[in-house]
């Protein structure tokens, strides 16, 4: 099974993947985030945040309040399963999480929590056999 994925978020506020599948056979899963754009992180920064679908809006709202210094993620937010730091153009970051944190049949969302980005920059993550 492929236990990692590469995803890019660009200056046009788009992720290059709308869906990520994670195999149950993976113990851990790694997301490699790349920003192929040119704009700095304070202007057009992107991160990759994973929550349950139902938790996305709350995590986005609290993340905005947390600010750039906290990567637009509320400190110790139990709703956030995994997240990268906020990166700017030309930068990369990775995050690895335990697949045991995912439940079969649950709907998971990934998104960028930079203010105003999540409406366009989001996708679905699924646990598969």
Curated annotation (Swiss-Prot):
UniProt superkingdom: Bacteria
One matching Pfam family: Copper-bind
Gene Ontology CC terms, in alphabetical order: periplasmic space
UniProt binding sites for Cu cation: 46, 112, 117, 121
Cysteines engaged in disulfide bonds, as pairs: 3-26
Electron transport among keywords: yes
GO molecular function, one term: copper ion binding
Entries under PROSITE patterns matching the protein: COPPER_BLUE
CDD domains: Azurin
Domain Plastocyanin-like: 1-129
Protein localization: Periplasm
Claim: Membrane is one of the keywords in the record: no
TM regions (residue ranges): none
Function: Transfers electrons from cytochrome c551 to cytochrome oxidase.
NCBIfam families documented for this protein: azurin
Name by which UniProt lists this protein: Azurin-1
Species, as recorded: Alcaligenes xylosoxydans xylosoxydans
């Amino acid at each position: 099974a492929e236990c990692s994925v590469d995803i890019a978020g660009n200056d046009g506020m788009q992720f290059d993947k709308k869906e990520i599948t994670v195999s149950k056979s993976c113990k851990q899963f790694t997301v490699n985030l790349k920003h192929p754009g040119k704009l700095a992180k304070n202007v057009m920064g992107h991160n990759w945040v994973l929550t349950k679908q139902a938790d996305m809006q709350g995590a986005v709202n609290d993340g905005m309040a947390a600010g750039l210094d906290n990567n637009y993620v509320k400190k110790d937010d139990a709703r956030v399963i995994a997240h990268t730091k906020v990166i700017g153009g030309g930068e990369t970051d990775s995050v690895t999480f335990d697949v045991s944190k995912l439940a079969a049949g649950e709907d998971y969302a990934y998104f960028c929590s930079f203010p105003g980005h999540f409406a366009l920059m989001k996708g679905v993550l699924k646990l598969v056999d």
